[in-house]
């Protein structure tokens, strides 16, 4: 029989991550590359492993993530969301600490659209009273 696999889908901004957790040593692979190579910023790599810290499961699972859309920040958040959801499959008792840390909530903040007549979403040409 194949070893246990736990799946979770995470989303953040315009990124979608499909995450698999496999019992292992804590190796994280994103789009077939090690996380150190894929995400160049240490603070964003810390974001990715947050769910393991909250549930005290550091180094217990290997993570295989496929992520597309968005940039580094959105993709890191999407992977974190996917890992948190997959950990619920591992043990439903993880729900309380993950929810308390806010890791199960899909962050609804999105980029605001640009409006016509303005330079950006809210940036307008300088106003002249006279």
Curated annotation (Swiss-Prot):
Molecular-function GO terms, alphabetical: RNA binding; structural constituent of ribosome
Disulfide-bond pairs as recorded: none
Source organism, top-level taxon: Bacteria
Membrane listed as a keyword: no
PROSITE patterns: RIBOSOMAL_S9
Gene Ontology BP, a term: translation
Matching Pfam families: Ribosomal_S9
UniProt-listed InterPro entries: Ribosomal_Su5_D2-typ_SF (IPR020568), Ribosomal_uS9 (IPR000754), Ribosomal_uS9_bac/plastid (IPR023035), Ribosomal_uS9_CS (IPR020574), Ribsml_uS5_D2-typ_fold_subgr (IPR014721)
Ribonucleoprotein listed as a keyword: yes
A single GO cellular-component term on record: cytosolic small ribosomal subunit
Keyword terms, alphabetized: Ribonucleoprotein, Ribosomal protein
Family: Belongs to the universal ribosomal protein uS9 family.
Name of the protein in question: Small ribosomal subunit protein uS9
UniProt source species: Pediococcus pentosaceus (strain ATCC 25745 / CCUG 21536 / LMG 10740 / 183-1w)
Biological classification of the source: Bacteria, Bacillati, Bacillota, Bacilli, Lactobacillales
């Amino acid at each position: 029989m194949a070893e246990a696999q736990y799946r979770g889908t995470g989303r953040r901004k315009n990124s979608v991550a499909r995450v698999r957790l496999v019992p292992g040593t804590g190796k994280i692979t994103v789009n077939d590359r090690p996380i150190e190579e894929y995400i160049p910023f240490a603070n964003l790599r810390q974001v990715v492993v947050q769910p393991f810290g909250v549930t005290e499961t550091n180094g217990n699972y290997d993570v295989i993530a496929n992520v597309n859309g968005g940039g580094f920040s959105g993709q890191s958040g999407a992977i974190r969301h996917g890992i948190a959801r997959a950990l619920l499959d591992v043990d439903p008792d993880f729900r309380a600490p993950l929810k308390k840390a806010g890791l199960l909530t899909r962050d609804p903040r999105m980029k605001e659209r640009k409006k016509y007549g303005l330079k950006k979403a809210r940036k307008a040409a300088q106003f002249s009273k006279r």
